[in-house]
């Protein structure tokens, strides 16, 4: 999706005030359901971390974090988090969680280099979750079973919203479809990765694409991933077909996390082996951190999807350029 897309004849199904009420109801329901389904405990999350810790999410490796210094500790370069992908794994260790237990956070982040459009904002709000598994559970079966459990939360949330607001129609299929990024490329060799996502989601409605970060047979990647949290062979994206846009929309990115071997392999491929010296990476390589599975689920994306909104700014307060604000107002898109 480029810049701003205006759905033809768009009219919001809820007023501004109804939207605010629905956002709270939806978030509360989803959060409770997710915690029960995955056995997660809510914990407090940092808004910023010390750059030298290696805990911030480097995303695709080119995005600049918001950084600042502070009077009390001028020697530190402090960064607003991009996500808590690595912090959560360390927290599971520090809080002495056991196998089968996990945590989740109500995470807020700023991604200053995000390209703004209907589904992208510099303000990111998501449920970041992480759960301890055994090394023997680092396999596709564990990944798929966890995805199915999360999809069950999405289905229950849609039922909840439709029951409260009957003029919102159900669109999610009964089951989630799995496909690897290589199978997807083989299926649609002439399409871009984003076009492939829409093609497969139009066919099946809800899809989990497995294996993101490494190169495909074509020599291209399906998408970029940081080399030091997801195992690129055991991760993926959860996408739904969104009729309002006639496109696939990503609701969650998740995966089984790197072990010692896959971390070293991926750091070498990504040409950033110097990260091995950072405290987080040292702990991982020394076997001090638990093996985990985890991910992030976009709160505003979920609200936008289930409330059938045309712009993420209808469900969160952020910054938008004047042209986008004006065009939205002219087309019944009321930004918060």
From Swiss-Prot:
A GO-annotated cellular component: cytosol
Pathway: Amino-acid biosynthesis; L-asparagine biosynthesis; L-asparagine from L-aspartate (ammonia route): step 1/1
Signal peptide, first to last residue: none
One GO term (biological process): L-asparagine biosynthetic process
Keyword Cytoplasm: yes
Membrane-spanning residues: none
Chief subcellular location: cytoplasm
Subcellular location: Cytoplasm
SUPFAM superfamilies referenced in this protein's UniProt entry, alphabetically: Class II aaRS and biotin synthetases
Enzymatic reactions: L-aspartate + NH4(+) + ATP = L-asparagine + AMP + diphosphate + H(+)
UniProt record similarity statement: Belongs to the class-II aminoacyl-tRNA synthetase family. AsnA subfamily.
Protein name: Aspartate--ammonia ligase
Organism annotation: Clostridium perfringens (strain 13 / Type A)
């Amino acid at each position: 999706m480029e810049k701003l897309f205006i759905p033809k004849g768009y009219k919001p199904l809820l007023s501004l005030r109804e939207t605010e009420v629905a956002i709270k109801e939806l978030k509360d329901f989803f959060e409770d359901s997710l915690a029960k389904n995955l056995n997660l405990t809510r914990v407090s999350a940092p808004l910023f971390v010390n750059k030298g810790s290696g805990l911030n999410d480097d995303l695709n490796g080119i995005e600049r974090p918001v950084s600042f210094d502070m009077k009390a500790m001028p020697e530190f370069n402090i960064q607003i988090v991009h996500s808590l992908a690595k912090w959560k794994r360390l927290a599971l260790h520090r809080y002495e969680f056991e196998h089968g237990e996990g945590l989740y956070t109500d995470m807020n982040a700023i991604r200053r280099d995000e390209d703004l459009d209907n589904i992208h904002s510099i303000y990111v709000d998501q449920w970041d979750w992480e759960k301890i598994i055994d090394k023997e559970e680092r396999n596709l079966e564990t990944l798929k079973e966890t995805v199915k459990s999360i999809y069950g939360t999405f289905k229950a949330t849609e039922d909840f919203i439709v029951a409260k607001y009957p003029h919102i129609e159900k669109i999610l299929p009964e089951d989630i479809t799995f496909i690897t990024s290589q199978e997807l490329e083989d299926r649609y060799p002439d399409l871009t990765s984003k076009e492939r996502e829409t093609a497969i989601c139009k066919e099946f409605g809800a899809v989990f694409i497995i294996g993101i970060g490494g190169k495909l047979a074509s020599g291209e990647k399906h998408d970029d991933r940081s080399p030091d949290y997801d195992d690129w062979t055991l991760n993926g994206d959860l996408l739904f077909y969104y009729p309002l846009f006639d496109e696939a929309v990503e609701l969650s990115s998740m995966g089984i996390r790197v072990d010692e071997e896959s971390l070293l392999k991926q750091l070498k491929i990504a040409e950033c082996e110097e990260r091995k010296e950072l405290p987080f990476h040292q702990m991982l390589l020394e076997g001090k951190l638990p093996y985990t599975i985890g991910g992030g689920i976009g709160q505003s994306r979920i609200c936008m999807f289930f409330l059938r909104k045309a712009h993420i700014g209808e469900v969160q307060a952020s910054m938008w350029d004047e042209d986008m604000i004006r065009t939205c107002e002219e087309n019944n898109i009321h930004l918060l």
